[in-house]
Amino acid sequence: MQIGLVAQSPLDQFEIVPLIPMNIGNFYFSFTNSSLFMLLTLSFFLLLIHFITKKGGGNLVPNAWQSLVELLYDFVLNLVKEQIGGLSGNVKQMFFPCILVTFLFLLFCNLQGMIPYSFTVTSHFLITLALSFSIFIGITIVGFQRHGLHFFSFLLPAGVPLPLAPFLVLLELISYCFRALSLGIRLFANMMAGHSLVKILSGFAWTMLCMNEIFYFIGALGPLFIVLALTGLELGVAILQAYVFTILICIYLNDAINLH
């Protein structure tokens, strides 16, 4: 009876649990639940593409799954064409696969986290930060490859008085570095906050429903409807955050290419 009264923390759902611990010398590696669900996301994506294209490029009349993949493909392709300027269509195609894979990975990870008893990979700051910094380093390399040392002019707006130049360069450099940080924090914070809120309200509604009194049962209907509404909202947030992450990548890449 006492065990049933112990309240679980809404943050327990974000705990990384080692499934297969491994020790290599002084280094500790482990296959965790986070690794498992990232692998499941990748497997689902590869299987989906395989079943759609196994007959040699898809059906002439697309089925529902093929239509979904084509819709996502065209959506990201149009996003790249609209947000990245100053390049020919063939050059833009070089960046398209990376942006498409990033969008689909985040989309599937976010939606997978909505399944009960699953794990939300993007709710961990280190994972989103590693993703944002790795992409941002790649964007910076593209900027140096295209402009060389002239890429540093990105840090100094035109027409700035010389006495203010050192301060503005420092501020622009900090602002530039914080782009990668904010990119990871935005995704992590939205996914973690939304899932925690759904967990808190669903736990409250379940506790009210488990009580025998009719007053508590009626009182649980309000939180229950709120949970259902928040679940729908969280689905929208999962899709929106993948879109926001992707469009910001395109904007930052456009800035690096065109020195905006």
UniProtKB/Swiss-Prot annotation:
Q: What does this protein do?
A: Mitochondrial membrane ATP synthase (F(1)F(0) ATP synthase or Complex V) produces ATP from ADP in the presence of a proton gradient across the membrane which is generated by electron transport complexes of the respiratory chain. F-type ATPases consist of two structural domains, F(1) - containing the extramembraneous catalytic core and F(0) - containing the membrane proton channel, linked together by a central stalk and a peripheral stalk. During catalysis, ATP synthesis in the catalytic domain of F(1) is coupled via a rotary mechanism of the central stalk subunits to proton translocation.
- What GO biological process terms are annotated to this protein in UniProt? proton motive force-driven ATP synthesis
Q: Which organism is it from?
A: Brassica napus
Which keywords accompany this UniProt record? ATP synthesis, CF(0), Hydrogen ion transport, Ion transport, Membrane, Mitochondrion, Mitochondrion inner membrane, Transmembrane, Transmembrane helix, Transport
> CDD domains this protein is in?
ATP-synt_Fo_a_6
Q: Which family does it belong to?
A: Belongs to the ATPase A chain family.
Assembly mode: F-type ATPases have 2 components, CF(1) - the catalytic core - and CF(0) - the membrane proton channel. CF(1) has five subunits: alpha(3), beta(3), gamma(1), delta(1), epsilon(1). CF(0) has three main subunits: a, b and c.
User: Single GO molecular-function term?
Assistant: proton transmembrane transporter activity
Q: Spell out the subcellular localization from the entry.
A: Mitochondrion inner membrane
Q: Point out the coiled-coil segments of this chain.
A: none
One cellular component (GO) term of this entry? proton-transporting ATP synthase complex
- Give me the segments passing through the membrane: 29-49, 95-115, 124-144, 151-171, 191-211, 213-233, 237-257
Q: One Pfam family, short name please?
A: ATP-synt_A
Q: Which Gene3D superfamilies match?
A: ATP synthase, F0 complex, subunit A
Descriptive protein name: ATP synthase subunit a
The topology of this chain with respect to the membrane is: Multi-pass membrane protein
Does the keyword Signal feature in the UniProt annotation?
Answer: no
